[in-house]
């Protein structure tokens, strides 16, 4: 055997073991009954919310201009969407002006509810509610990072500290909504990177936020469970959703929302199974 062939064999063996770097980053729930397996079809229409103007826009190399955003919003209305996420108004002047234009020029149909996104940070929440001044109704979407990796490597925080961030943001939502009685608000919370979060912790932090908002049958809270990074086969995500739905407090007064990204090419399967 030549030196060259020996080296080739070593490189081949190394490449074949390349899969080992992909560690399991998700967490299975403590109880996973997978009752959804018994369903062979979806028998109830979901509520569709377009996130193209926010999440889709972030994916573009050159984000949409104000004019393009207005045209796209009108297109989504014509398609028939009744909930449309219009952006992250505290993120940039364009995002802010887009929202203000929709409100001030009365471009939002009576049967359409706009949605905006905000991190759980004081000044961003304040700016977000300011941008909504004059809106007839709106969904305000709060999020903060909860995954094991982000807690350990980015924020270097304990679980209690992460919960405090979410709860404080939820309390600010209550405060600002009370100052704007002319607007009909619906609140939404996301544990960002839900799929990389321990399920017991995801449940705990969601329940803490729900406790602050006190949903009712007439004022339901949305709990969004995103696959911010797709980490598993679809049945794992479905098991995670099943666990959350079975254990969230005030479940009858909640709307559970799914937001799967397509990193693994399984976003549609994630949505249907979840």
Question: What role is predicted for each listed range?
Answer:
Residues 2-122:
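N-terminal capping/small domains of soluble enzymes
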Residues 3-5, 14, 49, 186, ...:
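Generic secretory/membrane-interface signal
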Residues 86-91, 116-117, 190-195, 226-230, ...:
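Conserved short loop/turn motifs at secondary-structure junctions
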Residues 262-274:
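Thiamine diphosphate
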């Amino acid at each position: 055997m030549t030196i060259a062939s020996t080296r080739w064999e070593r490189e081949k063996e190394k490449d074949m073991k390349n899969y080992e770097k992909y560690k399991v980053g998700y967490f299975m729930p403590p109880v996973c009954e997978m009752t959804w397996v018994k369903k062979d079809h979806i028998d109830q229409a979901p509520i569709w919310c377009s996130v193209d103007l926010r999440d889709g826009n972030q994916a573009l190399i050159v984000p949409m201009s104000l004019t393009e955003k207005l045209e796209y919003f009108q297109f989504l209305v014509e398609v028939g969407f009744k909930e449309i996420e219009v952006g992250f108004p505290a993120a940039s002047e364009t995002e802010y002006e887009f929202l203000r234009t929709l409100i001030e020029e009365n471009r939002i149909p009576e049967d359409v509810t706009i949605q905006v996104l905000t991190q759980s940070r004081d000044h961003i929440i304040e700016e977000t509610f300011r941008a909504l001044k004059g809106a007839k109704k709106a969904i305000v979407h709060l999020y903060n990072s909860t995954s094991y990796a982000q807690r350990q490597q980015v924020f270097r925080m304990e679980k209690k500290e992460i919960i405090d961030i979410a709860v404080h943001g939820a309390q600010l939502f209550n405060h600002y909504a009370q100052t704007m009685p002319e607007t009909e608000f619906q609140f939404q919370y996301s544990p960002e990177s839900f799929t990389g979060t321990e399920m017991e912790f995801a449940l705990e932090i969601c329940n803490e936020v729900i406790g602050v908002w006190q949903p009712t049958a007439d004022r339901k809270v949305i709990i969004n469970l995103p696959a911010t990074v797709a980490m598993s086969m679809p049945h794992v995500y479905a098991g995670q959703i099943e666990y959350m739905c079975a254990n969230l407090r005030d479940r009858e007064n909640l709307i559970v929302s799914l937001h799967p990204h397509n990193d693994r090419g399984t976003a549609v399967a994630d949505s249907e199974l979840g």
